[in-house]
Amino acid sequence: NLVQFTYLIQCANSGKRASYHYADYGCYCGAGGSGTPVDELDRCCKIHDNCYGEAEKMGCYPKLTMYNYYCGTQSPTCDDKTGCQRYVCACDLEAAKCFARSPYNNKNYNIDTSKRCK
């Protein structure tokens, strides 16, 4: 679910950047999404949005689905073996890892999406 996603983000980036920094970034990080992603980090969010869309097609509720994960010393892992929990955790895990390896550009935080996301 979205709360667990914030914890996975923190785990994947070793607490270097608070998860709220990703809530209003670029064209796809946060609610909604349109246009062309502004950078690599924004592409991570678009992929995550698409993954949630696929989960919904499977009958899952990704924003609400609780799952089991482990925040290890190397990187987080998903513990569920089947179903929506496994799929949604995988969506969140891949996005969190993508965030951790992608540069963060302060200029792409809280942008005017009506102008830059066409």
Swiss-Prot record:
A cellular-component GO term for this protein: extracellular region
E.C. code: 3.1.1.4
Major localisation: secreted
Cofactor requirements of the protein: Ca(2+)
Compartments (UniProt record): Secreted
BP GO terms, sorted: arachidonate secretion; lipid catabolic process; phospholipid metabolic process
Highest rank taxon of the organism: Eukaryota
Tissue: Expressed by the venom gland.
GO molecular function: calcium ion binding; calcium-dependent phospholipase A2 activity; phospholipid binding
Subunit structure: Monomer.
The protein's name in its UniProt record: Basic phospholipase A2 3
Gene source species: Laticauda semifasciata
